[in-house]
C-alpha cells in the first residue's frame, strides 16, 4: 500500500483558552483529492492553516512526504512542496499579474522561471491577457485564478485550497474548479476546503466532515449521500455551480 503523502494525527489547535480542533486525524493518498467540509466555524480553515504551518498545533502531529512538519515554519513547508492557497485570495493586489507570478517562482532556478510562468498562464489564458494589469483591479474570479496559478507555478506536490469559491458567482467558481481538476490530472494532490459541497464531492476521492472542531464523518466521497450531508452540514450545503447557472460575477 502506498504511504500517505499527508498524514494528520490527533491534531488539537487552541486560540488562547478556546479550542478550535479536537483530535483531528486525516490521511491523504498521493494524487488524490480530499474534500474537507463543514459549516462556518467548524474548523476547516484552522485545519488548513495548521497543516501549512501558519497556526501552531497544541497537540498532535503532521507528516508530509514522510517527514514530520508539525513545528516547521510555513516557508519551509512551502519549499518542501506543500502550497497553501488562503481563503480570500492569495495575491499581491498592488503588483501586476506577471509580477505576482514572478514572485511566486522567485525560489525556482532562474533558468526555470520563464517556463513556470508560461505554464501558469497556459492554465488560465485570461491572465496572459491581463499580464500588465494590477492584480487588485481584476475581477474576483480572475484574482482567484491568479491565486491558483501562483500556487501551481511552482509544481507543488500538494495544494491546500481553502474556500476558493468564496464570494464567486457559480459560473466563475466552476472555472476555478476546472483549474483544480487540471492540477489533479497532472498528478498534484489536493486538499479542498469548500462551500460548494456537491461540486467538491464530485471532484473528491474521499471526504472529511468537521463539526465544531471534531471529525463528524469520514469516508469515500461517493458514500457521502444526502443523508450524511443533511446530518452533518445542514445549511452549509450550498448549491452546485451548475445548479446556479444564471449566477453573475
Language-model segments: residues:
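Conserved ABC transporter NBD signature motif
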Residues: 60-67, 80, 113-117, 217-219
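Conserved beta-strand-loop-alpha-helix hinge in the C-terminal portion
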Residues: 214-236
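ABC-type ATPase nucleotide-binding domains, specifically the catalytic core motifs of the NBD
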Residues: 16, 72, 97-115, 123-125, ...
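ABC ATPase C-loop
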Residues: 151-152
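Helix-to-loop junction immediately C-terminal to a conserved catalytic motif
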Residues: 52
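Conserved ABC ATPase signature
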Residues: 134-138, 142
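The feature captures the beta-strand-to-loop junction immediately N-terminal to the Walker
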Residues: 37-39
Amino acid at each position: 500500500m502506498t504511504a500517505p503523502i499527508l498524514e494528520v494525527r490527533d491534531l488539537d489547535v487552541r486560540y488562547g483558552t478556546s479550542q478550535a480542533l479536537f483530535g483531528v486525524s486525516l490521511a491523504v493518498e498521493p494524487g488524490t483529492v480530499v474534500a474537507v467540509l463543514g459549516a462556518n466555524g467548524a474548523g476547516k480553515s484552522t485545519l488548513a492553516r495548521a497543516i501549512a504551518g501558519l497556526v501552531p498545533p497544541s497537540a498532535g502531529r503532521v507528516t508530509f512526504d514522510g517527514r514530520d512538519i508539525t513545528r516547521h515554519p510555513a516557508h519551509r513547508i512551502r519549499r518542501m512542496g506543500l502550497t497553501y492557497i488562503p481563503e480570500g485570495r492569495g495575491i499581491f493586489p498592488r503588483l501586476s499579474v506577471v509580477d505576482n507570478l514572478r514572485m511566486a517562482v522567485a525560489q525556482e532556478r532562474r533558468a526555470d522561471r520563464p517556463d513556470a510562468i508560461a505554464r501558469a498562464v497556459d492554465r488560465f489564458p485570461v491572465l496572459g491577457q491581463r499580464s500588465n494589469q494590477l492584480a487588485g483591479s481584476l475581477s474576483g474570479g480572475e484574482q482567484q485564478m491568479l491565486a491558483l496559478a501562483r500556487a501551481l507555478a511552482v509544481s507543488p506536490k500538494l495544494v491546500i485550497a481553502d474556500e476558493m469559491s468564496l464570494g464567486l458567482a457559480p459560473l466563475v467558481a466552476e472555472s476555478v474548479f476546472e483549474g483544480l481538476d487540471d492540477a489533479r490530472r497532472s498528478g498534484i494532490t489536493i486538499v479542498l476546503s469548500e462551500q460548494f459541497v456537491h461540486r467538491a464531492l464530485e471532484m473528491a476521492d474521499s471526504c472529511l466532515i468537521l463539526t465544531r472542531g471534531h471529525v463528524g464523518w469520514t469516508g469515500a466521497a461517493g458514500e457521502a449521500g444526502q443523508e450524511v450531508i443533511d446530518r452533518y452540514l445542514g445549511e452549509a450545503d450550498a448549491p452546485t455551480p451548475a445548479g446556479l447557472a444564471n449566477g453573475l460575477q
